[in-house]
């Protein structure tokens, strides 16, 4: 019984990957949801507003000022921005 369930799940997984690949091939290199395309359409001003003047949202950092508001640089490795447990402006 367990083997037949595992085989069924494996077949369904392979079919999903196969149909997804076929659908991607039908559409070609359609990049409608690409972040680069959104930046080109909306312009840099949308992504660089005064409110978002921070350098790192959740990426690497070396000091607290590298992170966005309400985030701080983690003190131990791996260094990245984490929530500093504050809310509000």
Swiss-Prot record:
Coiled coil: none annotated. Residues 1-22 form the signal peptide. The modification Isoleucine amide is found at residue 87. Expressed by the venom gland. The keyword Kinase does not apply. Disulfide bonds join 54-68, 61-73, 67-81. Keywords: Amidation, Cardiotoxin, Disulfide bond, Ion channel impairing toxin, Knottin, Neurotoxin, Secreted, Signal, Toxin, Voltage-gated sodium channel impairing toxin. One of its GO terms (molecular function) is sodium channel regulator activity. It comes from the Eukaryota. GO terms for cellular component: extracellular region. InterPro entries: Huwentoxin-1. It is found in: Secreted. Residues 23-52 form a propeptide. Its main location: secreted. The presence of a 'disulfide through disulfide knot' structurally defines this protein as a knottin. Belongs to the neurotoxin 10 (Hwtx-1) family. 39 (Jztx-34) subfamily. Gating-modifier toxin that inhibits voltage-gated sodium channel Nav by shifting the threshold for channel activation to more positive potentials. This toxin moderately inhibits human Nav1.7/SCN9A (IC(50)=459 nM) and weakly inhibits hNav1.2/SCN2A and hNav1.5/SCN5A (<20% inhibition at 1 uM peptide). Inhibition of Nav1.7 is voltage-dependent, with lower inhibition at more positive test pulses. This is Mu-theraphotoxin-Phlo1a.
